[in-house]
Amino acid sequence: MVGREDVQSFLEQFHAKMKVFGIIYRDDRGKNRKALEELEIVPSYRKIVIESLVIDDYVEGPVIDTLNKFGEMWVFGKDVKEREVYIKIMISELIPQTICISFHLAEHPLRYPFK
């Protein structure tokens, strides 16, 4: 089972790497682009939301990326403009940048084990 310390360690590594190398967004996924429109936010605002992730926002992970095999994915949730947003991020083993795979409205209520 993942503990608070594991989530904190991941977030520290993720934010440090994001600060140095940046982040790649999977904007080729339609629901990620659509979420920006529905939330009426500019793409760069996602970075602010992701930078503000804390342990209490943790939903699940690490989940193995069996599709692309880039590493482990971690899922978080955050309220943006009073709407719950599903955020899936990862530290890639293959490229220096961090990756935001999903940033879209939650399709169902998220469960936060540390809240």
Residue locations for each model-derived region?
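Enriched for short, Lys/Arg-rich terminal
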Residues: 90-115
